[in-house]
C-alpha cells in the first residue's frame, strides 16, 4: 500500500533546525499518511483528539485541561488560531496572556500529546467576526476569502507569522514538536456556492493550498468541509454530528473527522443544548467501524468568551458546548468517563483497525456487522441503527443483545467490551455553593458612578463627520460595541414628532436634547429593526444622539465584507402627526466610537475615580451606570462563578479582567425539545428535531466564570459592572462550583467506582443503594429495592474518601432484592 511521505523529508529540509532541536534532547518525528491512517514514525496510528481553544481559558488552566484530556484517552489537542486576537491592529501583534499560543503548544508537548494547528485564519468558531480582524475592511478593494490580492496578502502575512513562530519554537513534528497536522482555510466548501463567482472561489481555495504547502512545515495540510474542488495537495476532512458515512474525495488519504460536535453553542435567546454521552459514543464507534482514522471532539473543553470575543451575533459569554470538560474545566460526567471507556477499547484494537482486512455485512433491521482480521486475530463491531428497537444479533454462534441506536465493540469478536448505550461511568451533579469566606458580609456593599453621556449629547467633538449614515464595523473598526451617531437641526417653535430609525442593529438607544427617548434591540436572527419614539423639539437647535451597539459580529457565512451593522443608510426621520417626514439621513452626522467610561478605563478602578455610595443607597434600574464592590475570594481551589441575576445587560470585570458581556434579563425561549430527551435517534441542533434542551424560560446565562488566576487570596477583590440597560446589583453573589451528588448504575459482576473529584472533596453520605429500577435522576433517585448489604459495603468503603471502588456481587443484593442492576447515589 502506497504511503504519502508528506513529512518524511522534514529532518533533511530543516536540518539545521532539527540539529539544534536534537542538541536539546528532542527527536525528529515524521508524519505521513495512507488510505487507512496517519503514519507517524513509520507506524500507522488511530488518533483521538479534542479541541481546546487557548483564548477561551487562562494559561493557569491549560496544564490541568490538557492533563484531563490525556487521562480521558486523548492523543492530541486541536485548536484554531485567532487572527483578530493576535493582530487586533494591523501589524500590531499580541501573544501575551491567554493569547500566548507558543506556551499553550509547549504545555501540549509537555503532556506528551500531539497537536493539530488549525490556522484558518478564518475560523468561524462562534468567535467575533469568525476570527477576521475588522481592520481588513479598511483596505481598498478588499474581498474576504476570494481570489483577491488585498485579502490574500494579509492572509499570507498572518499565516507565515504563525508558522514562523511555531518553527522558531520547534513546534512542528519534524523539529521534535507536537504538531502533526495543520489546517488552512475553514469550511469553505459550505459557502463556495454562495459567493457569486465560482472561478474566483476556486482560484482562491487552490491558492490557499499552494501558499500553505510553500511554507514547508513538514506535516500534512488539511481542509475541512471541502468536498468538491479539493486541491490535490491537501487532505479534505469532515465536520458534523456524524461522519461515519463520509469518505474523502480520493483514494490514498485517510478518513479524518475534524469536528465531532459534542453539543452546541448557545445564543442569548436559546436554552442549553445537550448531546448525550450515548449518542456521541455511538457516532464515534460507527466512525471507527467505517474506517475512520482520526477523530476530534469539537469541543473537548469549550471555555469562556472573555471580553468581546463572542461572535454570532448574540452568542453568549459561556462557550460550554456541553463538552466532556465543562466551561470551568470540571469533568462532565458521565460524558467524560463514557468516552474514556470507548477510547480504551478502540486503542486496544488499533493495529487490527489500521492493518487488518475488513468485511462489512448488512443484516436486516438496519444492523451492520464489520469484522476486521489481522493474522489470527479479529475484532468486530455490531451496529444497530434502529432508533426504537433493541435487537438480538447472532455473530459466530454467539447471540448479543444490542440496544437501539448503539454499537457494540467486541475485540475478539466474542465478548462485548463496550456498548455505546450502556454507561458504566459515574454521573456527577455539580452544584453552586455560596461564598463561605469568613467575615464576608451577608450582601455585597456597592458604590456607583454615572456614565458621562454629556459629551455625546451634542454633535460636537466627534472623530469625524459625514453627510451620510455610515456602517458601524468600518467606522468603529470594532474597537467598541458602541458607536455614536449625532446630528442637529434648527427648528422654529415647539412641535411633537415621531423619531423613526431603521437600523441593522443589534441594539439602539435614542436621545433627543440629552433625554433618553427610546431603546430597542433586534430579535436574534432578524437584525434589521426599527425604533419609533415620540419626541418633542424646542425652538432653536435640537440635538439627536443615537447610540448603536453590536453584540458580537457575525462569524459564519459568505461575503463578510458586505455584512452591515449599525444605522447604515437609515433612514432616520422625524415624522409629524400628518405623516410628513423630515429625513435626516443625509444631514451632517458626527461619529464617535465607544463610551466615556471606556476611554477613562473605569474598569481598572484607578486612583482618583469618584465613586458614590450615597450613604448605602444605590440607584437601581437606571441605564448607563457603573457599579463597584469588593469581595473575598472563595476558599479553596474550586471553580468560582458570579451570579448576576437581577442585572439587565452590560459587562463585568474582576480586578480589571473582562469576564465578558452579561445579559441575564434575556430569557431562553420555550422549545419543544426542553420536554423530551432520548439518546436514540439523530441529534440535531437546528430544525424541528431538537431534543435534550434545558433552561427554557430561564435566563440564557446567569452565572459567569471568574478564573482563579483573576483572584487575589487574602485581600479584597474588585468587581466592576457597567450596567447599560438598567438593573439591580443587590442580588449579585459569588459561588463555588463543586460536586454535589455522584451516581453509578452497574450490573452484578461489575465494579462501581465513586469519586468526588479534585481538590480533596470526600464522600460524606451514601444516599441510595438500590437494586432494580430506580426512578428519577441523579441527586433525586427513589424507588427500587434498597439493599442493606450494599449500603453497608459502600459506607465502609467510601465514607470520608475522595474515591472508592466496590465489586458488585450477588451477596450485596440482600434478602428480598432480585439480582440485577445496582444504583448507588452518594453526596460529596
Swiss-Prot record:
Keywords: Apoplast, Glycoprotein, Glycosidase, Hydrolase, Secreted, Signal. The keyword Cell membrane does not apply. One of its GO terms (cellular component) is vacuole. Gene3D superfamilies: Galactose-binding domain-like (2.60.120.260), Glycosidases (3.20.20.80). It holds the Pfam family BetaGal_gal-bd. Transmembrane segments: none annotated. Glycans are attached at residues 157, 198, 249, 260, 362, 366, 392, 502, 578, 586, 615. It catalyses: Hydrolysis of terminal non-reducing beta-D-galactose residues in beta-D-galactosides. It is an enzyme of class 3 (hydrolase). The active site is at 187 (proton donor), 259 (nucleophile). Residues 746-828 form the SUEL-type lectin domain. It is found in: Secreted, Extracellular space, Apoplast. Its main location: secreted. GO terms for molecular function: beta-galactosidase activity; carbohydrate binding. Its EC number is 3.2.1.23. Residues 1-23 form the signal peptide. InterPro entries: BetaGal_gal-bd, Galactose-bd-like_sf, GHD, Gly_Hdrlase_35_cat, Glyco_hydro_35_CS, Glycoside_Hdrlase_35, Glycoside_hydrolase_SF, Lectin_gal-bd_dom. One of its GO terms (biological process) is galactose catabolic process. PANTHER family: BETA-GALACTOSIDASE RELATED. Belongs to the glycosyl hydrolase 35 family. This is Beta-galactosidase 13. It comes from Oryza sativa subsp. japonica (Rice).
Amino acid at each position: 500500500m502506497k504511503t504519502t511521505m508528506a513529512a518524511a523529508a522534514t529532518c533533511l529540509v530543516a536540518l539545521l533546525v532539527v540539529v539544534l532541536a536534537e542538541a536539546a534532547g528532542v527527536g525528529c518525528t515524521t508524519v505521513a499518511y495512507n488510505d487507512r491512517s496517519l503514519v507517524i514514525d513509520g507506524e500507522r496510528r488511530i488518533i483521538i483528539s479534542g479541541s481546546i481553544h487557548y483564548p477561551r481559558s487562562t494559561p493557569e488552566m491549560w496544564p490541568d485541561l490538557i492533563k484531563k484530556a490525556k487521562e480521558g484517552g486523548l492523543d492530541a489537542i486541536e485548536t484554531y488560531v485567532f487572527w483578530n486576537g493576535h493582530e487586533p491592529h494591523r501589524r500590531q501583534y499580541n501573544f501575551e496572556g491567554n493569547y500566548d499560543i507558543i506556551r499553550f503548544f509547549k504545555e501540549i508537548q509537555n503532556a506528551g500529546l500531539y497537536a493539530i494547528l488549525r490556522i484558518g485564519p478564518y475560523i468561524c468558531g462562534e468567535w467575533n467576526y469568525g476570527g477576521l480582524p475588522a481592520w481588513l475592511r479598511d483596505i481598498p478593494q478588499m474581498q474576504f476569502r476570494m481570489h483577491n490580492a488585498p485579502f490574500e496578502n494579509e492572509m499570507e502575512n498572518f499565516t507565515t507569522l504563525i508558522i514562523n513562530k511555531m518553527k522558531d519554537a520547534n513546534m512542528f513534528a519534524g523539529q521534535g514538536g507536537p504538531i502533526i497536522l495543520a489546517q488552512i482555510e475553514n469550511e469553505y466548501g459550505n459557502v463556495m456556492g454562495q459567493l457569486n463567482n465560482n472561478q474566483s472561489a476556486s482560484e482562491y481555495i487552490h491558492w490557499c493550498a499552494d501558499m500553505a504547502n510553500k511554507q514547508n512545515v513538514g506535516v500534512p495540510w488539511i481542509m475541512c468541509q471541502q468536498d468538491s474542488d479539493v486541491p490535490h495537495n491537501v487532505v479534505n476532512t469532515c465536520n458534523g454530528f456524524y461522519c461515519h458515512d463520509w469518505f474523502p474525495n480520493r483514494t490514498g488519504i485517510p478518513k479524518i473527522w475534524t469536528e465531532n460536535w459534542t453539543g452546541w453553542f448557545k445564543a442569548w435567546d436559546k436554552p442549553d443544548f445537550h448531546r448525550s454521552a450515548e449518542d456521541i459514543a455511538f457516532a464515534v464507534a460507527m466512525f471507527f467501524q467505517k474506517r475512520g482514522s482520526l477523530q476530534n471532539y469539537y469541543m473537548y473543553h469549550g471555555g469562556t468568551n472573555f471580553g468581546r470575543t463572542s461572535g454570532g451575533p448574540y452568542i453568549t459569554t459561556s462557550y460550554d458546548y456541553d463538552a466532556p470538560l465543562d466551561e470551568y474545566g470540571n469533568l462532565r460526567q458521565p460524558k467524560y468517563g463514557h468516552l474514556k471507556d470507548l477510547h480504551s477499547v478502540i486503542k486496544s484494537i488499533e493495529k487490527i483497525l489500521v492493518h487488518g482486512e475488513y468485511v462489512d455485512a448488512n443484516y436486516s433491521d438496519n444492523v451492520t456487522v464489520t469484522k476486521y482480521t489481522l493474522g489470527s486475530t479479529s475484532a468486530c463491531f455490531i451496529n444497530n441503527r434502529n432508533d426504537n428497537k433493541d435487537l438480538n444479533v447472532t455473530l459466530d454462534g454467539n447471540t448479543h443483545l444490542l440496544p437501539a441506536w448503539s454499537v457494540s465493540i467486541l475485540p475478539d469478536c466474542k465478548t462485548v467490551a463496550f456498548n455505546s448505550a450502556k454507561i458504566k461511568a459515574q454521573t456527577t451533579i455539580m452544584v453552586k455553593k455560596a461564598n463561605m469566606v469568613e467575615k464576608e458580609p451577608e450582601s455585597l456593599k456597592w458604590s456607583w458612578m454615572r456614565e458621562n453621556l454629556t459629551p455625546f449629547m451634542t454633535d460636537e467633538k466627534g472623530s469625524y463627520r459625514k453627510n451620510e449614515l455610515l456602517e458601524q464595523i468600518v467606522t468603529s473598526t470594532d474597537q467598541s460595541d458602541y458607536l455614536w451617531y449625532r446630528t442637529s437641526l434648527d427648528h422654529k417653535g415647539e412641535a411633537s414628532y415621531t423619531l423613526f430609525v431603521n437600523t441593522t442593529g443589534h441594539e439602539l438607544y435614542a436621545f433627543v436634547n440629552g433625554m433618553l427617548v427610546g431603546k430597542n434591540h433586534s430579535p436574534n436572527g432578524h437584525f434589521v429593526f426599527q425604533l419609533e419614539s415620540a419626541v418633542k423639539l424646542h425652538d432653536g437647535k435640537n440635538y439627536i444622539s443615537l447610540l448603536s451597539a453590536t453584540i458580537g459580529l457575525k462569524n459564519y457565512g459568505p461575503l463578510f465584507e458586505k455584512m452591515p451593522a449599525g444605522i447604515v443608510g437609515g433612514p432616520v426621520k422625524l415624522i409629524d402627526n400628518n405623516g410628513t417626514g423630515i429625513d435626516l439621513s443625509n444631514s451632517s452626522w458626527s461619529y464617535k466610537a465607544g463610551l466615556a467610561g471606556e476611554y477613562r478605563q473605569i474598569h481598572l478602578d484607578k486612583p482618583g475615580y469618584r465613586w458614590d455610595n450615597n450613604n448605602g443607597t444605590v440607584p437601581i434600574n437606571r441605564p448607563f451606570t457603573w457599579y463597584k464592590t469588593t469581595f473575598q475570594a472563595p476558599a479553596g481551589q474550586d471553580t468560582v462563578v458570579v451570579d448576576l441575576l437581577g442585572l439587565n445587560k452590560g459587562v463585568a470585570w474582576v480586578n480589571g479582567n473582562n469576564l465578558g458581556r452579561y445579559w441575564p434579563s434575556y430569557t431562553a425561549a420555550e422549545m419543544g425539545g426542553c420536554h423530551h430527551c432520548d439518546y436514540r435517534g439523530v441529534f440535531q441542533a437546528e430544525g424541528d428535531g431538537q431534543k435534550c434542551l434545558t433552561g427554557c424560560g430561564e435566563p440564557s446565562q446567569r452565572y459567569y466564570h471568574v478564573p482563579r488566576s483573576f483572584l487575589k487570596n487574602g485581600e479584597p477583590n474588585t468587581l466592576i459592572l457597567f450596567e447599560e440597560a438598567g438593573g439591580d446589583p443587590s442580588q449579585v453573589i459569588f459561588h463555588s462550583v463543586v460536586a454535589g451528588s455522584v451516581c453509578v448504575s452497574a450490573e452484578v459482576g461489575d465494579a462501581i467506582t465513586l469519586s468526588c473529584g479534585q481538590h480533596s472533596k470526600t464522600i460524606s453520605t451514601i444516599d441510595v443503594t438500590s437494586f432494580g429500577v430506580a426512578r428519577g435522576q441523579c441527586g433525586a433517585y427513589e424507588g427500587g429495592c434498597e439493599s442493606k448489604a450494599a449500603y453497608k459495603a459502600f459506607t465502609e468503603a467510601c465514607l470520608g474518601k475522595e474515591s472508592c471502588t466496590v465489586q458488585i456481587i450477588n451477596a450485596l443484593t440482600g434478602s428480598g432484592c432480585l439480582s440485577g442492576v445496582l444504583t448507588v447515589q452518594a453526596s460529596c
